[in-house]
Amino acid sequence: MTTDVEKPPQRNGNHIKHKLIPSKLVSPPSGPQGPYRLPKNQHFRDHRRFGFSNIMLVLVILFLFAPLFVVITYSFNAAKGMRWTGLSLEWYKKLFFDSNELWRAFGNSIMIAFSSALVATMLGSLAAIGIKWYRFKARAYIQIASFLPMVLPEVIIGISMLIFFSAIKVQLGMFTIFAAHTTFNIPFVFLLVSARLDEFDFSIIEAARDLGATERQALFKVVIPSIMPGIVTSMLMSVTMSLEDFVITFFVSGPGSTTLPLYVYSMIRYGVSPVINSLSLVLILGIMILALTLRRFLKTIAASS
């Protein structure tokens, strides 16, 4: 049922006319000067800005994903060069049945990437928690020093690692690559976990201690579950950085420790085989599956917390 509101009387000569208007059609003023109205050209400016943003977004996506699209497309090319001659699965057959050295290098990369990422994640996370938890004089200096490997050129880090391992007489090989990758991954883990800890309310730890929890119990039952998304993200980034590293690995590698980047680089003198394009597609699919699995894992953690 609608109620009618009387409109102010309108004078027409000597008579006053009254007109009833439904209250649903009466818009109350939104301010002291009545309802706000956009300028006439405001909608045009917003539409133009929206269109420009879309164009820039498309250009950025093309810049990022066009090389991947080219690599995936030419992995199905029958010819070895850039000239397209037709679809073929020849390079995938060679990848899975005639590329023993490539798979050996790929296995070395996977083993070093996950092992170094695991150790770097544990050390970097504990370091970030310790820096945020305890107060001491050298705290600021340690934070600054932890960022140095991130800003130093990889060539300098690689040469420093080589000199260090030579000084302590450690034979170059898988262990030296593992140690080097762990070293340069720790600062990235420290940075990501520290950013997550900045959002953490440490009064929860005090409440847990008041309820009788020890420091170790508060760490494993309160702190770590709360920052687990940051820990998992830092580990994934460490794996990615270890897989693609070439410069530092080049300095600290030895006989029998060829990784995938080193193997691809050694092929340049003879020409890179299209088998690498096929391997790229396999890696992309593997990383996508890993990312989706971690995304589901992080959602489960967020829902449980």
Cite the ranges covered by each PLM segment.
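Membrane-interfacial helix termini and adjacent extracytoplasmic/periplasmic loops
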Residues: Y36-H43, G81-M82, L89, A138-R139, ...
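Transmembrane alpha-helices
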Residues: I55-M56, I61-L68, F190-S194, F200-F202, ...
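Non-cytoplasmic
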Residues: V70-A79, V189, I231-Y265
